[in-house]
A protein has these predicted regions:
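Terminal intrinsically disordered/low-complexity segments used for targeting and assembly
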Residues: 2-79, 237-296, 468-475
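Intrinsically disordered, glycine/charged-rich N-terminal periplasmic/extracytoplasmic linker segments
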Residues: 65-112, 127, 134, 138, ...
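Transmembrane beta-barrel architecture of outer-membrane proteins
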Residues: 70-72, 128-132, 176, 221, ...
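Membrane-embedded beta-strand positions in outer-membrane beta-barrel channels/transporters
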Residues: 74, 132-134, 178, 291, ...
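Small/polar (Gly/Ser/Thr/Ala-rich) solvent-exposed segments
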Residues: 85, 105-127, 136-169, 185-187, ...
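Amphipathic alpha-helical coiled-coil segments
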Residues: 86-101, 166, 172-190, 200, ...
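Periplasmic alpha-helical coiled-coil/stalk elements that build and connect Gram-negative outer-membrane
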Residues: 154, 161-290, 399, 423, ...
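Metallo-beta-lactamase
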Residues: 236, 299-300, 378, 455
Length: 475
């Protein structure tokens, strides 16, 4: 009866602790520090207003990338990619850890039967056995269990966000590789068409040389340029295979052909260009959203915030280690020295223990200091993450605008050089121009066509980078 009274007394003391300020302080909840400055995007003159509704980040990747073949490819990568599967497994591990942390509030129960045979001076053998059932329960008087549970929950949130980051990176990478394939296909078409034209020009030059109208130097120069186009065709085909292999690796499959649509048929949030009739990216028609409302949804910023949350609870748990730990124990069972038929004597035992650390060779103090420093370090990293996020948005916007502005110039340049090439070729046929002028016109036109295509690709890359920088691609 006295033991029971002592247990009740200890329990009462624990209940009293729940009402004191120290107990509440040790169980304090983390207050999010995710403050995004209003000027996170920068002060560029090209970025003055941020429409608050319909931000680009609110688009799911299926809404953002409307090309059916690209959608199918992204779905296949998300279903089979090794890195994403590993991230999903990491989430499951964190869920198991959180479940174990929640069960720490419950008592542990052990059944440890034992038996023995004994004899004194070769006398009769005495048999005995014990059948105890032991219960241990830690009292969360100073929030150690609570803080560890909350830290485990923060770890789970981090694992989930890391999965989102992997998912967004895969969406971005697949889209970029897909548009790279389209670019290479388009450049291969340009080079193939150029190959046919230059081959015809080369045959004309050979005929003129055979008739003594030009020197062999002209033929050699033309053939050299023609062979250069041939090598570019080989390089482009090789690059196509490399990109297809890279996508195959993302699919966790052996190298294979990647189906894609034709250049210019893929749809992205764009604006029709009134000058050329083409569709091109324009920051004026892209809703990016207010930084405080958009950037806080970026997975890397949420990851940094959850890391600070985990560090906060780890610091709380480290602080709780300075205070006593209280444990309740109980044992119930029976023992018998005369076999198993008669249960013999019933065993009952109950006790409470309190352990107050006095000297632990500085381990507790060191752990607390390390936890505090980790928390401070993560706070600084969070600020840097926000700065980096705003910088990425600014850079992507600048790239979009640059590609948009250059497109009209490239388009006009191609038109002018095509006219120059046709005119120069006609002049040479009439003997009013030489092969060097024709050769220069041909090479200039080819380079302008390739540059125009590359600029279109850079525009696509920029809008994808902006989409990811605003937190898109996770859903």
């Amino acid at each position: 009866m006295r033991k029971l009274t002592n247990i009740v007394t200890v329990a009462a003391v624990c209940l009293l602790l729940t009402g004191c300020s120290l107990y509440k302080e040790m169980r304090g909840e983390y207050q999010s520090q995710s403050v995004i400055p209003t000027n996170a995007y920068g002060t560029s003159q090209d970025i003055k207003e941020y429409p608050t509704n319909g931000s680009l980040a609110n688009y799911s990747w299926r809404e953002f990338f409307t090309d059916p073949l690209l959608q199918q490819l992204i779905e296949q990568v998300l279903a089979h990619n090794t890195d994403l599967n590993s991230a999903c497994i990491a989430v499951e591990k964190s869920e198991a850890s959180l479940k174990a942390a929640k069960l720490a509030y419950l008592p542990s129960l052990y059944f440890s039967p034992s038996g023995s045979l004994s004899s004194f001076d070769f006398g009769p053998v005495s048999k005995s056995y014990n059948m105890p059932l032991q219960l241990n329960m830690d009292i969360d008087a100073f929030g150690s269990i609570t803080n560890k549970k909350r830290a485990a929950n923060a770890l789970l949130l981090q694992a989930q966000v890391r999965e989102e980051i992997v998912r967004a990176n895969l969406v971005s990478t697949v889209a970029q590789q897909y548009y790279m394939l389209q670019l290479l296909d388009h450049q291969l078409e340009i080079l193939t068409a150029t190959d046919s034209l230059w081959n015809a020009s080369l045959e004309t030059e050979k005929t003129l040389w055979e008739n003594g109208k030009i020197y062999s130097t002209a033929v050699n120069q033309m053939e050299s340029s023609y062979l250069n186009v041939k090598t570019q065709i080989v390089d482009t085909r090789r690059n196509i295979r490399s990109v297809e292999n890279a996508i195959s690796r993302l699919l966790a499959e052996t190298p294979q052909h990647i189906n894609r649509s034709y250049w210019g048929s893929s749809a992205l949030p764009e604006h029709p260009d009134s000058t050329t009739g083409q569709r091109m990216f324009d920051t004026k028609f892209i809703k990016i959203g207010v930084p405080a409302e958009v950037l806080q949804n970026r997975p890397d910023i949420r990851l940094a915030n959850f890391a600070m949350e985990e560090a906060f609870y780890n610091t709380q748990a480290a602080r709780a280690a300075f205070f006593p730990s209280i444990t309740l124990q109980g044992v119930a069972g029976w023992t018998n020295r005369e076999g198993t038929v008669n249960p013999g004597k019933i065993l009952l035992n109950a006790m409470a223990s309190l352990t107050q650390p006095i000297f632990a060779r500085g381990t507790i103090k060191a752990n607390h200091k390390i936890a505090q420093l980790t928390e401070e370090d993560l706070q600084r990293k969070y600020v840097q993450t926000v700065i980096d996020a705003g910088n990425q948005v600014n850079e992507a916007l600048a790239d979009c605008q640059a590609a948009r502005e250059k497109y009209a110039y490239y388009h006009r340049q191609v038109e002018v050089l095509r006219e120059a090439y046709i005119g120069t070729h006609e002049l040479m046929d009439n003997g009013k121009s030489n092969y060097l002028e024709v050769l220069t016109a041909q090479e200039s036109l080819l380079n302008a066509q390739l540059s125009e295509a590359l600029n279109m690709y850079n525009g696509a890359q920029a809008i994808i980078a902006l989409y990811i920088a605003l937190g898109g691609g996770t859903k």
